[in-house]
Curated annotation (Swiss-Prot):
Homology family: Belongs to the aldolase class II family.
Positions with a binding annotation for Zn(2+): E81, H99, H101, H163
Function noted in UniProt: Aldolase involved in the non-carboxylating pentose bisphosphate pathway, a nucleoside degradation pathway present in some halophilic archaea. Catalyzes the cleavage of ribulose 1-phosphate (Ru1P) to dihydroxyacetone phosphate (DHAP) and glycolaldehyde. Can also catalyze the reverse reaction, condensing DHAP and aldehydes. In vitro, can condensate DHAP with various aldehydes, including glycolaldehyde, acetaldehyde, propionaldehyde, isobutylaldehyde, DL-glyceraldehyde and DL-lactaldehyde.
Entry's Gene Ontology BP terms: pentose catabolic process
Enzyme Commission identifier(s): 4.1.2.-
Signal peptide positions (record): none
Active site: E81
SMART domains: Aldolase_II
InterPro entries, sorted: Aldolase_class_II_sugar_metab, Aldolase_II/adducin_N, Aldolase_II/adducin_N_sf
Renumbered residue ranges of the record's region Disordered: 20-42
This protein's name: Ribulose-1-phosphate aldolase
Reactions listed under catalytic activity: D-ribulose 1-phosphate = glycolaldehyde + dihydroxyacetone phosphate
């Protein structure tokens, strides 16, 4: 079975989407080595299947797709957002992608409002979370809009206008953790604004200090 480790990771973590996105919307993927496929090294990924409950598929069902969009393996059809995942994986630092319609982040997205640096934890994904311009879901146009927004903002996450949120990371656990961070910060921002308050934003210098401290954080 090709990309077995990555497919198992998709099955293991897919249920976590249930806490982040309604119904069967949203998707996640993990980049594989590609060494055991016809794709080149790093040029294939395992992704959640389309339209299936998060606990409704097994390892052999998980689709494997090349970064060129070609379906390589898996009993089920891949997510409709394959173009988005394929485009983002052009960035060599990306090892996993999580896409949700989580309510607080999506509330910002439908208002076309980026998430500013109101809390130091935003540095988990960058200095702000931009909004990618709207395009129909599952299209190459949307995929390119997302890549452009993240690249221009220097962010590993982006809101998607009138749609939702996408977060990238070197691994799936970090991508999911950072998705929760963005959702939490979006809630803080919107609740502060709803209370008639004006959230204060951190300066670039303050954010740089946080980034330096993060380099020595953890075990």
């Amino acid at each position: 079975m090709i990309l077995e480790t990555e497919r198992r990771a998709v099955v293991e973590h897919a249920s976590e989407l249930a806490d982040l996105t309604p119904g069967r919307t949203g998707n996640l993927s993990v980049r594989g080595s590609g060494d055991d496929t016809d794709a080149g090294p790093g040029d294939a990924f395992a992704i959640t299947p389309t339209g299936v409950p998060y606990d409704g598929f097994d390892v052999e069902d998980v689709p494997v797709v090349g970064t060129d969009g070609e379906r390589l393996d898996g009993e089920m059809a891949p997510s409709s957002e394959v173009p988005m995942h394929s485009a983002i994986y052009r960035r060599e630092d990306v090892g996993a992608i999580v896409h949700t319609h989580s309510p607080w982040a999506t509330a910002l997205a439908v208002a076309n409002q980026p998430l500013p640096p109101i809390h130091y934890m935003i540095v988990a994904v960058g200095k702000r979370v931009p909004v990618a311009e709207y395009a129909p879901y599952g299209t190459d146009e949307l995929a390119e809009n997302i890549v452009t927004a993240m690249t221009e903002a220097g962010s590993t996450a982006s809101l998607i206008e009138n749609h939702g949120l996408v977060v990238t990371a070197p691994d799936l656990e970090t991508a999911l953790e950072n998705t929760h961070h963005v959702e939490s910060l979006a809630r803080l921002y919107l609740e502060s604004r709803s209370a008639g308050l004006e959230p204060q934003t951190l300066t670039d210098d303050q954010l740089e200090t946080v980034l330096e401290k993060f380099e020595s954080y953890g075990q």
